[in-house]
Every structure is written in C-alpha cells, then in structure tokens.
Amino acid sequence: MAKHHPDLIFCRKQAGVAIGRLCEKCDGKCVICDSYVRPCTLVRICDECNYGSYQGRCVICGGPGVSDAYYCKECTIQEKDRDGCPKIVNLGSSKTDLFYERKKYGFKKR
C-alpha cells in the first residue's frame, strides 16, 4: 500500500511484542512492498498501535484483522523489517478526497 501511495505515513516507533494482523482484503500481502510472494518474518507493531480499539486491527487499512501479517523475503533481506512499527497512521489523500466527494454529492454508504 505504501509503495503505491507515497503520502501514507508509517508509525515507525520501536516495535513491541504485539503481532500485526491483516484483514481479508489485505491477507497475504507484505506490509512494506505489497507483494504476495514468500512471506518470511512475522510483523511486530508497537504497543501504542495495538492499544484499546486498535487491538486486532489490520496494519494496512484498519479493518478487522483475520490473519497474522508477514514481511516478504526481500524486505527481510533488505532489513526493512527492522525499521520500526509498520502500521499506517494517516488516511492518505485518495481516501480523504473520496470521503469529501461522497459528502459533496450526498452518496450514502450501504
């Protein structure tokens, strides 16, 4: 997700013991590069990103988590799994624009 949307911001605090989760839509993706190949290392997120209502949520989109998140083999070799907590903190401009467009034209989500 972050590879294709450069305006998304990662948390990047020191990772704790909590394991990152992925929703059905994001299941099987690498958290950093969005590839579906060779899952390798389990994703750890910081305690702040796993607190309260955020517990068990998808690391990428914030939906309800169904499976554990993994880094792919390439990201593990390049040591991108050691950069800190990979949880995406902001919405990004595309989702924000979509929200305001829907609000402007009066579309309701079913």
Curated annotation (Swiss-Prot):
Phenotype when changing Y36C: No apparent effect on cell growth, localization of SF3B1 protein or formation of nuclear speckles
Assigned keywords, A-Z: Acetylation, Activator, DNA-binding, Metal-binding, mRNA processing, mRNA splicing, Nucleus, Phosphoprotein, RNA-binding, Spliceosome, Transcription, Transcription regulation, Zinc
Ranges where the record places region Interaction with SF3B1 and SF3B3: 35-51
Binding site for Zn(2+) 3: C30, C33, C72, C75
Modified residues (N6-acetyllysine): K3
Any one Gene Ontology molecular-function term assigned to this protein's record: DNA binding
Subcellular locations according to the entry: Nucleus; Nucleus speckle
Residues carrying N-acetylalanine: A2
Family, per entry: Belongs to the PHF5 family.
Function, in words: Component of the 17S U2 SnRNP complex of the spliceosome, a large ribonucleoprotein complex that removes introns from transcribed pre-mRNAs. The 17S U2 SnRNP complex (1) directly participates in early spliceosome assembly and (2) mediates recognition of the intron branch site during pre-mRNA splicing by promoting the selection of the pre-mRNA branch-site adenosine, the nucleophile for the first step of splicing.
Descriptive protein name: PHD finger-like domain-containing protein 5A
Species of the source: Homo sapiens (Human)
Gene: PHF5A
